[in-house]
């Protein structure tokens, strides 16, 4: 066989690390105020695993190793501001705010108005992740690990129950059966951790 053109420049596949389902200590990188496809007010919350998590800087490492031209950040949570059924503030928004407050003690105070989104930058929050099945473009199915709920960092450190996998035909996973306890651990010293200047936004 002759050497194919561009062989030396092609990056080989590396070992694929998967985010462990369960609780993770997260750092909020950015919050954007926007609207959903239906025109409802919402916020987009960009997250990465914190340096104190058992898998520190997970989404940054994955983003950096992605060679596709249209790569996207791997952990963005969309949260509606108003409950479309009641017309009042959504429980999800209040839960997000409460979890940030509990996770950052005196270093966080909720500010409404023009500085609302900037208020969350670099704050900590706990996240509960689960395996979710999805349909690929070719019709086959695959699995990804998604943030399903916010918690305080304290709750993550105490250990959250790992939720059941969410299959395509399941609207809601029935409870959180104990299959494994996940507790955040200090990072190892041999992993380069990202700082604020390393993120793409």
Q: What does each model-found stretch correspond to?
A:
Residues 1-201:
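Short beta-rich binding modules
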